[in-house]
């Protein structure tokens, strides 16, 4: 399971050893919409408007207006690449990440001399300091609210108990030379910390960490109830790497930073200060969100007052394309692991695999593969679906399939839905349940059953064969042969194109 990766540069070095996993360009690119527009055609995938595809991670070495900067996009934009980076089979990601969250390895603090993230230090009280010229924060579309840091891992602690630390990825829009707006959904742990500090009239120290070991980003995307209040998600990365994540004391705020991050923004969430997200553009939009739509600009967001920026020499700014495959990987793997652990604990051996499908951005749509071994297993598929919905509240739809269906092949899933489902008996709806705030369909205008914005109808599609009819639904039994001797050049090309990620 372990891989010799401590930071983003180690991850890049690993990808460079494999075909079709990493690409660099020296062609000049504008971070304002052009970069995302380019990567849409190379590797964004996901729910990005077609045409798009899944492709390699891409480094842009020549950023217009930023001669000493480079931007990486797409590090996590492939399930196979995630498996390569975590050192496991792509089909086993849910199981392996699920093991890690149950046995976290706590982070450790190292001295500044051992922290590459502080090789360069820029203090905000310097009269020449300007976040807008220091870092090339991209926009994804021409109608974004402004430049965003899309992979800024926020790290903050409970103001009443510094031993309670949380890390999560939040939407961060550059609002001035030393200000960022921060979108914090209700109930998020850092939002709880912020509210406590604000109630006391105090700022909340925070660091924004960018350019990280992929294991850190994946672990940070776990949510309650799998990682309850007080659970430090850096422990997941520690378990995945079998080595603790290293932290370092910030240079300007009393908070820790990821020691091997490429870039760290240090600052304070100010009490009682709010800003309109699109105050400089008046676009009405924020940025592309994972469902595939441009989210609305928030009229009132908390503000981070930047105190310092630290970075490595020749630092890499890491970003993603909002609704792309990268979001599916980052959000989806913790979703899958949470479902796996919950169902396996309640019905051991029944769930064979789980996939948080790209169409749902890793959050809305879960495909559960189950295996009925005896008559008593009939009905347990519904129990598994309910457990999944309970373990991950942001799920909207569950599709249940048998063990002979490839859950990573949408054609196979639709085949099961077409030939093994009858709408009048195979669909269970659960209306009136709180959904994810970014689902644009959960409004009273969309459905008369919805009493208020944010309420959704959860749906279970049972595409499994009833136990009593199993013998009538066996797939055509083709001969099991090795085709490679018949077309060696074709299979050599195929294996080369697939790389060594699987």
Task: Show the residue positions of the predicted features.
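Extended, highly charged
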Residues: 1-303, 307-502
């Amino acid at each position: 399971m372990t891989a010799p990766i401590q930071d983003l540069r180690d991850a890049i070095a690993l990808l460079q050893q494999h075909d079709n996993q990493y690409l660099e360009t020296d062609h000049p690119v504008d971070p304002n919409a052009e970069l995302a527009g380019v990567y849409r055609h190379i590797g964004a995938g996901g729910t990005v408007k077609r045409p798009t595809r899944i492709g390699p991670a891409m480094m842009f070495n020549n950023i217009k207006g930023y001669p000493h900067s480079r931007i990486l996009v797409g590090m996590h934009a492939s399930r196979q690449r995630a498996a390569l980076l975590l050192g496991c089979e792509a089909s086993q990601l849910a199981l392996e990440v699920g093991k890690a969250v149950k046995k976290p390895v706590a982070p450790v603090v190292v001295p500044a001399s051992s922290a590459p993230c502080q090789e360069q230090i820029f203090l905000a009280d310097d009269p020449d300091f300007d976040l807008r010229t220091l870092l090339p924060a991209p926009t994804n579309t021409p109608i974004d609210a402004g430049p965003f840091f899309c992979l800024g891992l926020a790290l903050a602690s409970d103001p009443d108990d510094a031993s309670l630390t949380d890390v999560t990825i939040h939407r961060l829009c550059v609002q001035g030379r030393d200000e960022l707006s921060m979108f914090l959904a209700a109930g998020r742990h850092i939002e709880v910390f912020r509210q406590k500090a604000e109630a006391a009239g105090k700022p909340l120290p925070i660091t924004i960490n960018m350019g990280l070991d992929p294991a850190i980003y994946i672990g940070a995307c776990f949510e309650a109830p799998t990682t309850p209040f007080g659970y430090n998600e850096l422990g997941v990365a520690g378990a995945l790497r079998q080595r603790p994540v290293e932290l370092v004391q910030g240079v300007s705020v009393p908070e820790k930073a990821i020691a091997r991050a490429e870039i760290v923004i240090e600052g304070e969430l100010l009490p009682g200060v709010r800003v309109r997200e699109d105050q400089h553009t008046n676009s009405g939009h924020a940025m592309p969100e994972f469902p595939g739509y441009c989210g609305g600009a928030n009229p009132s967001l908390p503000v981070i007052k930047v105190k310092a920026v630290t970075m490595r020499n020749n630092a890499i700014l890491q970003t993603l394309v909002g609704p792309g495959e990268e979001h599916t990987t980052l959000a989806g793997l913790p979703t899958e692991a949470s479902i796996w652990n919950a169902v396996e604990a309640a019905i051991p051996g029944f769930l064979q695999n789980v996939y948080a499908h790209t169409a749902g951005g890793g959050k809305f749509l879960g495909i559960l593969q189950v295996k009925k071994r005896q008559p008593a297993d009939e009905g347990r598929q519904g129990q598994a679906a309910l457990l999944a919905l309970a373990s991950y509240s942001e799920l909207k739809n569950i599709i249940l399939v048998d063990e002979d269906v490839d859950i990573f092949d949408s054609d196979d899933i639709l085949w099961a839905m077409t030939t093994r489902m009858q709408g009048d008996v195979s669909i269970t709806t659960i209306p009136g349940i709180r959904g994810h705030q970014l689902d644009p369909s959960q409004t009273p205008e969309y459905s008369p059953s919805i009493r208020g914005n944010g309420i959704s109808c959860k749906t279970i599609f049972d595409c499994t064969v009833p136990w009593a009819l199993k013998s009538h639904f066996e797939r055509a039994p083709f001969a099991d042969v090795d085709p490679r001797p018949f077309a060696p050049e074709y299979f050599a090309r195929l294996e080369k194109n697939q790389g060594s990620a699987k």
